[in-house]
From Swiss-Prot:
The lineage of its organism: Eukaryota, Metazoa, Chordata, Craniata, Vertebrata. The gene is Ctss. This is Cathepsin S. Glycans are attached at N100, N110. Residues 1-17 form the signal peptide. GO terms for biological process: adaptive immune response; antigen processing and presentation of exogenous peptide antigen via MHC class II; antigen processing and presentation of peptide antigen; basement membrane disassembly; bone resorption; cellular response to thyroid hormone stimulus; collagen catabolic process; metanephros development. Disulfide bonds join C124-C222, C134-C179, C168-C211, C271-C319. It comes from Rattus norvegicus. Belongs to the peptidase C1 family. The active site is at C137, H277, N297. Highest levels occur in the ileum followed by spleen, brain, thyroid, ovary and uterus. Low levels are found in the liver, kidney, jejunum and lung with lowest levels in the heart. Keywords: Cytoplasmic vesicle, Disulfide bond, Glycoprotein, Hydrolase, Lysosome, Protease, Secreted, Signal, Thiol protease, Zymogen. Thiol protease. Key protease responsible for the removal of the invariant chain from MHC class II molecules and MHC class II antigen presentation. The bond-specificity of this proteinase is in part similar to the specificities of cathepsin L. Residues 18-112 form a propeptide. Its main location: other.
Length: 330
């Protein structure tokens, strides 16, 4: 398997040349990920991107083995995509301007919070979803937060319809653009006004379609949403510990280190606070002495650690994870 670790060869023009020794691994990856490139030019482009990502993985993990990184990366179903393509297909967070607040969390400074929380252990988190090539991250983040509240309120864990939000919260009053992007609080406002169907009655299609909301299939509603103080990780910790899963926006969906993340605590110094992706914080803790947020993504089980990523906590609001946080109340 030494061949797999060989980095790509750089041509004079800076492009990465295909390595024939990787032919078998490329074919194996395509078969595993069910990739079929009918156009030879497309095949060649994808192969070069894949080799570039493979080289990044090998170099990063070599540095990780020397203690230079707190996380490892690995090849996954996005291995033949560029960072720009990943954010174009799967990001699309649209922060409202101005950012309106329907309520804010009042911190209890004297409250003792647990050292770690994982709402999955309490049955408040549904299975990991796959948004596909639709910028609906915001919808999955919002529905995930409400699913947790619904479980805490009724004792029932129900998958809610992200497609309902994609199709129906696009009116001017909400400002969401379906697969073109949106924001979690606007989704909450739609649910306050209308309610939301279940995933079973309104399944996900990964594309913009006509609104088919049916009140007969209503699975949940909420009375208001709460927004946390901007950039306050302590407030986020308190909300996650005492209220449930929290919707957040992050930057880094467009970084190779993020979409190829595999394990450990993600901490990339190049991460900014330029929001481009909506996710769900379902817990927090400490791993090997490094504090983290436990984050549920909507990129399927092949992303990260079975669909989850641990992101650095108490690290100057790393990736802006505490900048735009909210959760609904039933």
């Amino acid at each position: 398997m030494a061949v797999l670790g060989a980095p790509g060869v750089l041509c004079d023009n800076g492009a990465t040349a295909e390595r024939p020794t990787l032919d078998h691994h490329w074919d194996l990856w395509k078969k595993t990920r069910m990739r079929r490139n009918t156009d030879q030019n497309e095949e060649d482009v994808r192969r070069l991107i894949w080799e570039k990502n493979l080289k990044f993985i090998m170099l990063h993990n070599l540095e990780h083995s020397m203690g230079m990184h707190s996380y490892s990366v690995g090849m996954n179903h996005m291995g033949d995509m560029t960072p720009e393509e990943v954010i174009g297909y799967m990001g699309s967070l649209r922060i409202p301007r101005p950012w309106n607040r329907s309520g804010t969390l009042k911190s209890s400074s004297n409250q003792t919070l647990p050292d770690s929380v994982d709402w999955r252990e309490k049955g408040c988190v549904t299975n990991v979803k796959y948004q596909g090539s639709c910028g609906s991250c915001w919808a999955f983040s919002a529905e995930g937060a409400l699913e947790g509240q619904l479980k805490l309120k009724t004792g029932k864990l129900v998958s809610l319809s992200a497609q309902n939000l994609v199709d129906c919260s696009t009116e001017e009053k909400y400002g969401n653009k379906g697969c073109g992007g949106g924001f979690m609080t606007e989704a909450f406002q739609y649910i306050i006004d209308t309610s939301i169907d279940s995933e079973a009655s309104y399944p996900y299609k990964a594309m913009d379609e006509k609104c088919l909301y049916d009140p007969k299939n209503r699975a949940a509603t909420c009375s208001r949403y709460i927004e946390l103080p901007f950039g306050d990780e302590e407030a986020l910790k308190e909300a996650v510990a005492t209220k449930g899963p929290v919707s957040v926006g992050i930057d880094d969906a467009s970084h190779s280190s993020f979409f190829l993340y595999q394990s450990g605590v993600y901490d990339d110094p190049s991460c900014t606070e330029n929001m481009n992706h909506g996710v769900l914080v379902v817990g927090y803790g400490t791993l090997d002495g490094k504090d983290y947020w436990l984050v549920k993504n909507s990129w399927g089980l092949h992303f990260g650690d079975q669909g989850y990523i641990r992101m650095a906590r108490n690290n100057k609001n790393h990736c802006g994870i505490a900048s735009y946080c909210s959760y609904p109340e039933i």
